[in-house]
């Protein structure tokens, strides 16, 4: 009875806004910004009018707590029965421009009996009520959700335990997500403000059949349940509680999976300023979308692989402490053979590992990257060396980040790698990928080499030098930096070509897009070496060609301090 009463009151709000807002579409004053809303965004006149209508209905027919973008939190009516989460107009721009994709949405939770007295005792202390509601109630306490397209009249609604429904053209239809399994067949709605590299790549590579941008988050979530879309994605942490509350209930009751971009279920507090990223889809597409946009490792079982610098006792001692720490927490781990006699653990098996802890300097971290060998295994890079440009953590931070990994409270940074093919006597030799750089250098000291440098088959320069470096952005702080190359932020999609001690002063480092193909051709009858990340070597001779491209594989790091903090530390600035 209480549930149906809450639903009926919410429907009265929807109907009143629907009836009174339609005449305002096209009214020139509807577009005026009249204030800054409680959520910190500009509020249009049409939003205020819609919100005031909702307040009038709630005060007349009910009572409780209203949370809305414009007013913030308000106690309405005499009775403390319900919590209402309202978005008066979702898609305000569409409404003002007569684009028929805008909605009003509302969600309802029941105030628990024991909480009513406490709220009433503090009825004049709005800050206390905000804090109390936020600490006691979450989005999962909502049991009614309603979203109405005010332009078409399509009405989506759900009541907890009863499923989700669409009323359209006088017909009531039970709706739930479709069972499409292949991303290539999927239609996906996107929120694209603040495009990430992952999202740009997703669009560029056409990983789905079609992409749509409608501009009304609540409706787009409902479209996933009705089958008009197969997924909705917002990778930014800006989906607001009021934007999604009503649609969240409809999605939940319509068998949609709704999580943040990392696959963690939503548990948003009922507070105006709550924000989240969002992936909504059926169960078949969901893990695939998490793998594209989020931290897929959060939803994997954790087993650590320990890689440590063998000749540094301090690094070995830290590895022993880490292994003991993991044992005490009953977290499985595996170690290399030289360490197993001292700490136990399983034999090192890359196929069984979810994360690698690399303890040492940049050389150890590069070795860990080679052990990963193209697998999508994140590295926790712990600095025990002298500089540590690749390391994200110092030894004092390692136990804290291990706990964060165990509990899924961390982020991943994806780093591009460099691939190379050697064309020698009409044979093609494919080398391992490089995380830092590939260097072509004279095999005999003090002997100059000569190269033709091509970008996409266009001859860019003839270089005479001791060698030449092709570096990733990650490697820009390594050998390339010593050769006069620029420092490049790791998420820039580029490569750096840096001559080593060039004969001509005009031979300068060159930064090019990672979408290009680089070709080096050795011109002199002098033996040379291709050295990959300072360890793997190939002999190069006259007329051999080296083709460098962006690798299909990436390196993944558990994210620590910002790049610029790390840069200033490594350069001795602070």
Curated annotation (Swiss-Prot):
Activity control note: Phosphatase activity is slightly inhibited by ADP, NADH and ATP, and moderately inhibited by NAD and 5'-AMP. Kinase activity is slightly inhibited by ADP and NADP.
UniProt remark on cofactor binding: NAD kinase and pNPPase show maximum activities at 50 and 20 mM magnesium, respectively.
GO MF entry, a single one: NADP phosphatase activity
Protein residues bound to NAD(+): 362-363, 367, 436-437, 447, 464, 466, 477-482
The keyword Kinase is assigned to this record: yes
Keyword Hydrolase: yes
Cellular component terms (Gene Ontology): cytoplasm
Renumbered residue ranges of the record's region NAD kinase: 302-574
Compartment list: Cytoplasm
Alphabetical list of InterPro entries matching this protein: ATP-NAD_kinase_N, ATP-NAD_kinase_PpnK-typ_C, Bifunctional_PpnK_predicted, Inositol_monoP_metal-BS, Inositol_monophosphatase-like, NAD/diacylglycerol_kinase_sf, NADK
PROSITE patterns referenced in this protein's UniProt entry, alphabetically: IMP_1 (PS00629)
EC number: 2.7.1.23, 3.1.3.-
Residue sites binding Mg(2+) 2 per the record: 87, 90, 243
SUPFAM superfamilies: Carbohydrate phosphatase, NAD kinase/diacylglycerol kinase-like
Region described as NADP phosphatase: 1-297
Cofactor(s) the record lists: Mg(2+)
Alphabetically ordered keywords of this record: ATP-binding, Cytoplasm, Hydrolase, Kinase, Magnesium, Metal-binding, Multifunctional enzyme, NAD, NADP, Nucleotide-binding, Transferase
Reactions catalysed, as given in the entry: NAD(+) + ATP = ADP + NADP(+) + H(+); NADP(+) + H2O = phosphate + NAD(+); UTP + NAD(+) = UDP + NADP(+) + H(+); 5-methyl-UTP + NAD(+) = 5-methyl-UDP + NADP(+) + H(+)
Residue numbers binding Mg(2+) 1: 69, 87, 89
Record field: temperature dependence: Optimum temperature is 100 degrees Celsius for phosphatase and kinase activities. Both are inactive below 60 degrees Celsius.
Function: Involved in the regulation of the intracellular balance between NAD(H) and NADP(H), and is a key enzyme in the biosynthesis of NADP. Catalyzes the phosphorylation and dephosphorylation of NAD and NADP, respectively. Although it shows conflicting dual activities and is able to supply NADP, it seems that its physiological role is to prevent excess accumulation of NADP. Kinase can use ATP and other nucleoside triphosphates (UTP, TTP, CTP, GTP) as well as inorganic polyphosphate (poly(P)) as phosphoryl donors, however poly(P) is not considered to be the physiological phosphoryl donor.
Cross-referenced NCBIfam families: PRK14076.1
More about this protein: The phosphatase is inert toward the substrates of NAD kinase (NAD, NADH, ATP, and poly(P)). This demonstrates that the phosphatase activity never interferes with the NAD kinase activity by degrading its substrates.
Complexes and interactors: Homotetramer.
Family: In the N-terminal section; belongs to the inositol monophosphatase superfamily.
Name this protein carries in UniProt: Bifunctional NADP phosphatase/NAD kinase
Naturally occurring in which organism (per UniProt): Methanocaldococcus jannaschii (strain ATCC 43067 / DSM 2661 / JAL-1 / JCM 10045 / NBRC 100440) (Methanococcus jannaschii)
């Amino acid at each position: 009875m209480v549930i149906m009463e809450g639903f009926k009151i919410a429907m009265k709000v929807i109907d009143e806004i629907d009836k009174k807002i339609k005449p305002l579409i096209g009214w020139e004053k509807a577009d005026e910004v009249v204030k800054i809303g409680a959520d910190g965004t500009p509020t249009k006149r049409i939003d205020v009018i819609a919100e005031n209508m909702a307040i009038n209905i709630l005060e007349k027919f009910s009572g409780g707590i209203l949370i809305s973008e414009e007013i913030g939190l308000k106690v309405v009516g005499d009775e403390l029965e319900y919590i209402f989460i309202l978005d008066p107009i979702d898609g305000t721009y569409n409404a003002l421009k007569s684009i028929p994709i805008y909605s009003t949405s509302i969600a309802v939770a029941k105030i628990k009996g024991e909480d009513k007295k406490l709220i009433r005792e503090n009825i004049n202390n709005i800050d206390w009520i905000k804090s109390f509601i936020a600490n006691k109630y979450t989005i999962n306490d909502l049991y009614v959700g309603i979203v109405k397209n005010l332009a078409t009249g399509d009405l989506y609604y759900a009541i907890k335990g009863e499923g989700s429904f669409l009323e359209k053209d006088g017909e009531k239809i039970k709706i739930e997500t479709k069972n499409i399994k292949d991303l290539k067949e999927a239609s996906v709605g996107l929120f694209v403000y603040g495009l990430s590299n992952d999202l740009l790549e997703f669009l560029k590579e056409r990983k789905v059949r079609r992409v749509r941008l409608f501009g009304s988050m609540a409706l787009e979530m409902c479209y996933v349940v009705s089958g008009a879309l197969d997924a909705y994605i917002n990778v930014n942490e800006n989906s607001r509680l009021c934007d999604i509350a009503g649609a969240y209930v409809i999605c939940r009751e319509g068998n949609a999976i709704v999580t943040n971009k990392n696959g963690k279920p939503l548990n948003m507090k009922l507070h105006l300023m709550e924000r989240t990223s969002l992936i909504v889809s059926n169960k078949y597409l969901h893990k695939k979308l998490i793998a594209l946009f989020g931290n897929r490792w959060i939803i994997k079982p954790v087993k650590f692989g320990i890689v440590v610098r063998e000749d540094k006792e301090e690094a070995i001692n830290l590895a022993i402490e880490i292994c003991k720490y993991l044992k005490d927490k009953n977290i499985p781990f595996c170690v290399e053979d030289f360490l197993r006699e001292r700490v136990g653990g399983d034999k090192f098996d890359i196929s069984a590992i979810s994360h690698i802890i690399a303890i040492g300097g940049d050389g150890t971290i590069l070795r860990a990257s080679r052990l990963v060998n193209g697998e999508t295994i994140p590295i926790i890079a712990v600095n025990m060396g002298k500089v540590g440009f690749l390391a994200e953590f110092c030894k004092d931070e390692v136990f804290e980040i291990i706990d964060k990994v165990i509990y899924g409270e961390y982020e991943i940074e994806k780093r591009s790698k460099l691939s190379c093919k050697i064309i020698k006597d009409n044979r093609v030799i494919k080398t391992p990928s490089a995380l830092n750089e590939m260097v072509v250098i004279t095999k005999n000291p003090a002997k100059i080499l000569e190269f033709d440098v091509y970008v996409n088959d266009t001859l860019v320069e003839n270089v005479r030098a001791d060698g030449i470096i092709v570096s990733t952005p990650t490697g820009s702080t390594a050998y390339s930096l010593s050769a006069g190359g620029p420092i490049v932020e790791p998420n820039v999609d580029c490569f750096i070509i840096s001559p080593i001690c060039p004969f001509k002063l005009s031979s300068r480092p060159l930064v090019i897009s990672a979408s290009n193909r680089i070709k080096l051709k050795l011109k002199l009858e002098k033996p040379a070496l291709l050295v990959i990340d300072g360890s793997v070597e190939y002999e190069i001779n006259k007329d051999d060609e080296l083709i460098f491209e962006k690798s299909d594989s990436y390196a993944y790091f558990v994210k620590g301090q910002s790049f610029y903090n790390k840069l200033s530390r490594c350069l001795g600035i602070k």
